[in-house]
A protein has these predicted regions:
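Active-site nucleophile and cofactor-binding loops and adjacent substrate-binding regions
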Residues: 25-27, 46-56, 71-78, 133-134, ...
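Phosphate/pyrophosphate-binding active-site segments
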Residues: 1, 136, 204, 300-398, ...
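Short, internal active-site loops enriched in acidic
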Residues: 163-166, 400-401, 548-549
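Conserved short loop/turn motifs at secondary-structure junctions
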Residues: 217-221, 368, 450
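N-terminal alpha/beta PP-like core and its mobile active-site loop of ThDP/TPP-dependent enzymes
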Residues: 1-347, 363, 382, 470-475, ...
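Generic enzyme active-site microenvironment
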Residues: 158, 305, 395, 448-449
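Thiamine diphosphate
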Residues: 99, 108-114, 263, 270, ...
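Active-site diphosphate/adenylate-binding microenvironment
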Residues: 7-10, 15-17, 25-28, 33-37, ...
């Protein structure tokens, strides 16, 4: 008999599935796993200071590398601390496998110390959850977990292993290393004949259209079809609108790029969608922040929806044609059916909206030197320029700065813009940034966070320092929960209820962690400070104290249509 433990089997299964890095925090019910991990040096473990940080780090690692991220936690509070991170990954289609310890099998259901039914808790925010009842099931469960996490629309999968199963011995010779295949967990694809018929119909609609628009989401990045998208747009002279999570699917410098649509999208993106006679949604969810009021979205357009996930079709928006298939294969079939086109009349109309675009995006005139108190958008524009210059990965937290960065970012490679889009989880950026940097050690990574979101996960600075991760961290400090304050200004008569916040002296905080830190509060400090920060070898912290009551525009209010944008000139006076 060649005996091994369940914990050792779990470590070997992770290696076999291609895992290289684990983000986690140990505890009692997961101790056998951590003991086995000691004998598996090929599995790098990153000790996060909070389990939510571990989940976000696994998410950032997965987005930056295209590989499945792995996070680890103990039972009870350790496992429940993962939930926000798993929900963020679930909403944005990020492949993550979460490994949790559970109390020993006899204690399940008895309210044992640190017992939580974590499989039950995470049902709404995972693709599937496994409670491993037998040690011999471990190899198959991990095989299936990784397959499910990465297949179809990616997402998180949970593997919960009781402590006694981790410690149990099993004869290796009796094990099957192949994964169990549960047919009920796999969505049956459309037949080739159905897909071909759908593609023919899409081609007909596109070739007859006078005012088509491509609405692009994260599915383009996940399917690796940015090249096909660019070819389609160039060949058929198509305007391209990119969602928050699809910004890096199409070059911002391409003349056909109209930017981000939706609540804080560009005028030309929103007006183009509203005036279109055909909207082709490629790997996009048509969520409320993108389309505005559903019954008034693109009122004269036929809607085509390409998505690998059948449950995404008509979840929020009608679809005249739905193509449920891998986007790469769908576009491969569509491209030969689409001839070259000249859409000059449509483009002339779009150029009129271009001329009305936000004047604050105009570059400064030659010789211009910015002076005076620092503006938030001005600060973020400078950071965005540094990100583009170095082909860096941009990781944004949630709030006003998230929208400004999305508006200002230049060209980015697919997988280079990371943010919590669907869930909007504050505290995401710092741990996701460290995960991205570990996954892409040869690329610079910039974290952009507000003072509110930064304080939700700043304990991960200790992880950054311990692991020697050269993050560039820019904190936009306006002394408010900025996006909430903006809504209070517009809709609640400037009654700023519990949105003004204080924070630590970040120079002192950086010193406490041994991180070089700069404080900026004037425009003339920007360029020199960012240049210094960019060349530091280790992590750096840039504290940007900006004007307090700056707002993000344009803005489409909740319940409004995309062409009912409020611009800076139309803001309600205080």
């Amino acid at each position: 008999m060649v005996a091994t433990t369940g914990a050792d089997l779990a470590c070997r299964a992770l290696s076999r599935e291609g895992a290289q890095v684990l983000f986690g925090h140990p505890g009692g019910a997961i101790l056998p796993f951590y003991d086995a991990l000691y004998n598996h040096p090929s599995l790098r473990h990153v000790l996060c200071r909070h389990e939510q940080g571990a989940a976000h780090a696994a998410d950032g690692y997965a987005r930056a590398t295209g590989r499945t991220g792995v996070c680890v936690a103990t039972s009870g509070p350790g496992a429940t601390n993962l939930v926000t991170g798993l929900a963020a990954a679930f909403m944005d289609g990020v492949p993550v496998v979460a490994v949790t310890g559970q109390v020993a099998r006899p204690g399940i259901g008895t309210f044992a110390f640190q017992e939580t039914d974590i499989v039950g808790v995470t049902i709404p925010v995972t693709k599937h959850g496994f409670l491993v009842q037998e040690v011999s099931d471990i190899p198959g469960v991990f095989s299936e977990a990784f397959r499910l996490a990465a297949s179809g629309r990616p997402g998180p999968v949970l593997v919960d292993i009781p402590k006694d199963v981790q410690a149990a011995l099993v004869d290796e010779k009796t094990l099957s290393l192949s994964g169990r295949k549960n047919p009920e967990l796999v969505e049956p694809p459309e037949s080739t004949q159905e897909i071909e018929a759908d593609i023919q119909q899409v081609a007909k609609l596109l070739n007859e259209s006078q005012r088509p628009v491509l609405l692009v989401g994260r599915g383009v990045i996940l399917s690796g079809t940015s090249g096909k998208l660019s070819y389609l747009a160039e060949r058929n002279d198509l305007p391209v609108v990119t969602s928050l999570l699809g910004l890096d699917a199409f070059p911002a410098s391409d003349p056909r790029a109209l930017g981000m649509p939706g609540m804080h999208g560009t005028e030309r993106a929103n007006y183009s969608l509203q005036d279109a006679d055909l909207v082709l949604g490629l790997g996009v969810r048509f969520d409320d922040r993108v389309i505005g009021r559903p019954d008034r979205f693109a009122p004269n357009a036929r809607i085509v929806h390409f998505d690998v996930d059948a449950t995404a079709i008509e979840r929020t928006m009608r679809a005249d044609v739905a193509v449920v298939a891998d986007l790469s294969e769908s576009l491969k079939m569509l491209l030969p059916l689409v001839p070259k086109a000249d859409r000059s009349a449509w483009w002339e109309r779009i150029r009129e909206w271009n001329r009305e675009a936000d004047p604050t995006k105009e570059p400064p005139r030659p010789g211009y030197r910015r002076m005076g108190p620092l503006g938030a958008r001005e600060a973020i524009r400078s950071v965005a320029r540094k990100i583009s210059e170095s082909n860096a990965i941009a990781v944004s937290d949630v709030g006003q700065h998230q929208m400004w960065l999305a508006q200002e970012l230049g060209d980015a490679l697919p997988g280079s813009h990371l943010t919590s889009g669907g869930l909007g989880a504050m505290g995401y950026a710092l741990p996701a940034g460290l995960g991205a940097a570990i996954g892409q050690p040869d690329r610079s990574v910039w974290v952009v966070a507000g003072d509110g979101g930064f304080q939700m996960s700043l304990q991960e600075l200790a992880t950054v320092v311990q692991e020697g991760i050269p993050l560039r961290i820019a904190v936009i400090d306006n002394g408010y929960l900025g996006m909430v304050r903006q809504w209070q200004e517009r809709f609640y008569g400037r009654r700023y209820s519990e949105t003004q916040i204080s924070g630590p002296d970040l120079v002192a905080l950086g010193k406490a962690y041994g991180i070089p830190t700069w404080r900026i509060d004037r425009s003339e400090q920007l360029d020199s400070t960012l240049s210094l920060a960019a060349i530091e070898e280790g992590p750096v912290l840039i504290w940007m104290q900006v004007r307090q009551e700056e707002n993000v525009y344009p803005m489409v209010e909740s319940g409004a249509a995309l062409d009912e944008m409020v611009t800076e000139s139309e803001r309600v006076p205080g």
